[in-house]
Amino acid sequence: MVANTTGEIFKVTTFGLSHGKALGATIDGCPAGLNLSNEDIQNELNKRRPGTSNLTTSRDEKDKVEILSGIFNGMTDGTPITAIIFNKDQRSKNYDNLKNNPRPGHGDFCWREKFGNYDYRGGGRGSGRVTIGHVIGGAVSKKLLQQHNITTTAHVTSIHNIHSTKKFTLNTIKENITKNNVRCADLEVATLMEDEILKLKERGDSTGGKVEIIIDNVPVGLGQPVFDKIDGDFAKALMNIGAVKAVEVGCGIESSTLTGHEMNDEYYIEDNKIQTKTNNAGGIVGGMTNGMPIILKISVKPTPSVSGIQNTVNLEKRENSTIEIEGRHDPCICPRITTVAEAVCNMVLADHMIRAGYIHPDKIN
């Protein structure tokens, strides 16, 4: 059995395949009265669209979205919202050799063994292209969260062995990531990152990196202890992005090296607002938001589609074999994954905002 739906009240179901006819999402549980247009969704899809720079796959998809249902007079009507895009630039013949030869690093083997009848073209349902549905769901939830001035910003902090260590204000991050193709706030380091990606692309290799997500203006108390803690839901949502191999909250793995005095975020009150002097917890304690900015970090693996001959097995003959991967692939998925990370975090937030009573489940007040 596959799991294509996420959320308790604000539910997002994604559909489609890399080389199928179409992809999209159905959002159920969005209250009525939210202004929502094609443009709202298209703007987000454009940020993850392939073929926009020499750092991405050359697959030329425009990803033009069409809203099929759930909108009346320019606003949501409380019924399921379905939005779809149609694939235009598939080259399925490049994947003929994958039918019985799973690619190292991809999910081909597991999909084939579990389901048997598996559309292997372009990775099928396991392709990064299916995150189009994530971004559609994220665009709708982003509009909901804007009613409460909640913003989610993801930016690249490292590519391969190149790291950005400078600290920037949130406004500077938002501004700078639009000025380069890797979506890094450090403009000098961004140039080095681009050069590194292009160097690896030239030799048929790939790389990964790290992305930080900052969520601002979140109210206190989102999260449902003990099994629906909000950090657990963020971690699940982010780990469900295919290339993500680790999630950190706040100072993350560094917390294991600190003392209690170093780790604890001390409280203070200013202008009748309770805050913490530091934010090592990343805005989440006890599985609930504490009103400070939420800080999440993800580690993204290298794109597994690389040039050259690799060892694999022939599943039909049950014998060792080799494979040489063709097709068009990203040398580094980090720049495009920022939009997907923002999307899934917004979906989690929208669901918890409704569950906590901050957003009415039936209509926008």
Curated annotation (Swiss-Prot):
Keywords: Amino-acid biosynthesis, Aromatic amino acid biosynthesis, FAD, Flavoprotein, FMN, Lyase, NADP. FMN binds at R125, G126, S127, G286, K301, P302, T303, P304, S305, R328. GO terms for molecular function: chorismate synthase activity; FMN binding. InterPro entries: Chorismate_synth (IPR000453), Chorismate_synth_AroC_sf (IPR035904), Chorismate_synthase_CS (IPR020541). One of its GO terms (cellular component) is cytosol. The keyword Amino-acid biosynthesis applies. CDD domains: Chorismate_synthase. Reduced FMN (FMNH(2)). It catalyses: 5-O-(1-carboxyvinyl)-3-phosphoshikimate = chorismate + phosphate. Its EC number is 4.2.3.5. The keyword Membrane does not apply. This reaction introduces a second double bond into the aromatic ring system. Belongs to the chorismate synthase family. This is Chorismate synthase.
